[in-house]
C-alpha cells in the first residue's frame, strides 16, 4: 500500500517542481468520529508514514484531522502573500470498497478487499490556477502560457514572408505562436 502512496507523492514532487512551488506535507490521522477498526487505521496510517519517510522530505503529523473513512496526506503551498493553501491530497479509504463489496484475488488466490486511494494532485483546479497566477505574477512558464510568442513584422510588405517562415519554424518546434499582421495599422490608429 505504501508504494502506491509513494508513487502519488513522486507525482506531487514532479508537478509542483515544474510549477515552481515549495510545499509542505502533513499526515492527518484518525478523527474522533470515524469508521473502521483500530487495526485498519493503524495499518493505513503506517503506510502513509512510510511513504512520507520515503520522500526524504520533512513532514509533520496532524493528529485527528483525517477523513472519517481513512487517514490522508495533505500538501500545502504558500502563496505570494505567505498564506498556506491545502492543494494536493492523498487519502486512504478502506470503508467504501467494503461497503461496495469490492474484491480482488491476491497472489495466494485469496479474496481480499482493496484499499481505495483518493488522489488529487492539484486539489481544486480553480484554487491552483489562482495560486499559480499569483505565484508567477501573471508571467506563466513558457510551456504553460496561453500566448507563448508573437511574431510582429514591422512592415508587412518588406518582412511578411520572413515573419511567416519564422512563425512556421516556431510552430514546428511545438510553440503556440501568434502572428500579428496589422501592427503598422494599429500604430497609425494609436497616433
Pin down the residues of each PLM region:
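NTP/phosphate- and nucleic-acid-binding module
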Residues: 1-191
Amino acid at each position: 500500500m505504501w508504494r502506491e502512496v509513494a508513487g502519488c507523492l513522486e507525482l506531487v514532487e514532479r508537478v509542483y517542481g515544474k510549477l515552481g512551488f515549495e510545499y509542505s506535507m502533513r499526515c492527518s490521522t484518525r478523527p474522533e468520529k470515524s469508521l473502521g477498526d483500530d487495526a485498519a487505521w493503524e495499518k493505513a496510517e503506517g503506510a502513509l508514514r512510510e511513504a512520507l519517510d520515503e520522500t526524504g522530505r520533512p513532514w509533520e503529523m496532524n493528529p485527528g484531522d483525517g477523513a472519517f473513512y481513512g487517514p490522508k496526506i495533505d500538501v500545502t503551498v504558500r502563496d505570494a502573500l505567505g498564506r498556506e493553501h491545502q492543494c494536493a491530497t492523498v487519502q486512504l479509504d478502506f470503508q467504501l470498497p467494503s461497503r461496495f463489496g469490492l474484491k480482488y484475488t491476491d497472489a495466494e488466490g485469496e479474496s481480499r478487499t482493496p484499499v481505495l486511494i483518493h488522489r488529487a494532485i492539484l486539489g481544486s483546479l480553480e484554487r491552483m490556477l489562482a495560486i499559480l497566477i499569483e505565484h508567477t505574477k501573471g508571467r506563466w512558464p513558457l510551456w504553460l502560457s496561453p500566448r507563448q510568442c508573437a511574431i510582429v513584422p514591422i512592415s508587412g510588405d518588406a518582412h511578411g514572408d520572413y515573419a511567416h517562415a519564422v512563425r512556421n519554424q516556431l510552430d514546428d518546434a511545438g510553440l503556440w505562436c501568434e502572428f500579428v499582421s496589422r501592427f503598422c495599422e494599429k500604430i497609425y490608429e494609436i497616433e
